[in-house]
């Protein structure tokens, strides 16, 4: 079996298409992984802040609970906008302020998050019940866990959100 120049070109082109296809797939899955890593980091930050709950200003904050389907990103932004503050109590103040700042950083966006920004039917932040910092953090963690679960289940069911 002799290889002609035409066959070699086809083989090279096929190999390039396969190679480029794997690169595109890998880069899109890395975006999903970045999103999941960031969401898990947010849970860790919430857990860390729960350790310092007595060093937070005991102000009541809007704390979404039982968030409607497709309103998760709206509720997430309510948690990020809340004025969680350190009570300026000594050594822990810096740790608390850095953690609060990290909570307010945006996670890598997803298609679901972009679609949700256009929804006008989600409740406003002011409509949610206000809770003390401890319960606020517990509800925030619960929402993050729900969002991770939804993201993972959408990936396993083939309707990728990222």
From Swiss-Prot:
Cytokine with immunoregulatory activity. May promote the transition between innate and adaptive immunity. Induces the production of IgG(1) and IgG(3) in B-cells. Implicated in the generation and maintenance of T follicular helper (Tfh) cells and the formation of germinal-centers. Together with IL6, control the early generation of Tfh cells and are critical for an effective antibody response to acute viral infection. May play a role in proliferation and maturation of natural killer (NK) cells in synergy with IL15. It comes from Homo sapiens (Human). Transmembrane segments: none annotated. Glycans are attached at residue 97. Expressed in activated CD4-positive T-cells but not in CD8-positive T-cells, B-cells, or monocytes. Its main location: secreted. This is Interleukin-21. GO terms for biological process: cell maturation; cellular response to virus; defense response to virus; germinal center B cell differentiation; natural killer cell differentiation; natural killer cell mediated cytotoxicity; positive regulation of B cell proliferation; positive regulation of cell population proliferation. It holds the Pfam family IL15. Residues 105-126 are annotated as: Disordered.
């Amino acid at each position: 079996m002799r290889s002609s120049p035409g066959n070699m070109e086809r083989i090279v082109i096929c190999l390039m298409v396969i190679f480029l296809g794997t690169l595109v797939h890998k880069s899109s899955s890395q975006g999903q992984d970045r999103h999941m890593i960031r969401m898990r980091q947010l849970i860790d930050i919430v857990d860390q802040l729960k350790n310092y709950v007595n060093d937070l200003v005991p102000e009541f904050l809007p704390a979404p609970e039982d968030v409607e389907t497709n309103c998760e990103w709206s509720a997430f932004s309510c948690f990020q906008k809340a004025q969680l503050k350190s009570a300026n109590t000594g050594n822990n103040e810096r740790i608390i302020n850095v953690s609060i700042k990290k909570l307010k950083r945006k996670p890598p966006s997803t298609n679901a998050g972009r679609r949700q920004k256009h929804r006008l039917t989600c409740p406003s932040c002011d409509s949610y019940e206000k809770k003390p910092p401890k319960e606020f953090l517990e509800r925030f963690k619960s929402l993050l866990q729900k969002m991770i679960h939804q993201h993972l289940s959408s990936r396993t069911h083939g309707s990728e959100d990222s």
